[in-house]
Amino acid sequence: MVKPVRVLELITVPADFNGLTRFPMRLIAKMDPSAVRADLLTYAVGDERIRGEIETMGAKLYVAPHRLKHPLSYMRFVASLVRENRYDIVHLHGNSCTLAIDLWAAKRGGARVRIAHSHNTACKFTLLHRLLRPAFNALYTHAYACGDEAGRWLFGRKPFRIIPNAVDAEALAFSEPARADVRAEFGLKDEPVLGHVGNFVPAKNPLFLMEVLNRLPECRLLLAGDGPMRAEVEARAAEMGLSGRVIFAGARGDMPRLYSAMDALLLPSLFEGFPTVALESQCAGLPTILSEAVTRDCALTDFAAFEPLDAERWAARIREGLGQNRAQQSAEGRSAVVQAGHDLTHLAANLQAEYLRLVQADRPQK
């Protein structure tokens, strides 16, 4: 009997209902466990509910010491885990050359296939990013990216393979019953609901949402996510007299239901790789407004639009998009996402085949 390929999906953020965690989770769930057996590793758990989801998939979640606060302990932990579990592949998900820390540990543990996967177009640790680039370039064996811009950011002129972000399109179909249930949960009536999905961090630019809401007195704002800026956003809402119109829903595991309750999705990011949220919102038929910092590749429908960070322009664009036929737009969005190659089942099958090919290859090549 052929043993399954052992894969460690290493994420460089706390395990939570964020895109970087959900990306490998969704793919693992679609793979054949007799062919690929995968686990996840992080340095912190932001929401314990995610642990249950991972274990339900038949995978394990390992929590290492903090990778930047305690790098030596972290590297020893990762190397030991890779060695003990005999992982064939370590697939690292991040956005900077600080991945050199993780790559060194994976190599030390004996992993011959070490995939660096770029999920963004910028990072917080710019000095470390520059200093660690030579080590990073020497340590990865394969380069993946969520899109062209993210690939060029992390790998420069070196070759990389684009692994597109993907979603379960049919699971995101607009649902009138779900819309009614979620609106009842939050005490919403007929008022338009603007939505944002993401962590409360500077890159997501959550304070800009208050400026937009302030120009749309007829609207409510539903924020799904959590993070270090939440208290600051709550304070800004109170300062502007908007607290009664903003719903802080926290991290949620039922996003398809929440999308159905919304009337527009806003992504005013300052930098972004390829936002899975934009794919999800279009599958749900939501008018989707994105900052010009977001890659154009994620706009697959005519109800996704880009605007400069001018609150007046965003407010005008939102008013233009309200009142459309959601069921029809949802059907159009799901079709566009699948046709563009962002279907989760298809991507999981391709990545499973790639994992098997990499392990069978005599020697990994860059």
Regions found by a protein language model. Give the residues of each.
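Carbohydrate-associated surface elements
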Residues: 149, 166
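A charged, aromatic-enriched C-terminal amphipathic alpha-helix characteristic of glycosyltransferases
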Residues: 326-364
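A conserved, positively charged/aromatic
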Residues: 108, 115-145, 152-155
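N-terminal strand-loop element at the rim of the active site
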Residues: 3-4, 10-73, 229, 354
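Aromatic "clamp/platform" in nucleotide-sugar-dependent glycosyltransferases that forms part
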Residues: 251, 270
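A conserved mid-protein helix/loop that constitutes part of the nucleotide-sugar donor-binding site
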Residues: 18-26, 192, 196-215, 228-234
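A short helix/loop element that forms part of the nucleotide-sugar donor recognition site in Leloir-type
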Residues: 173-187
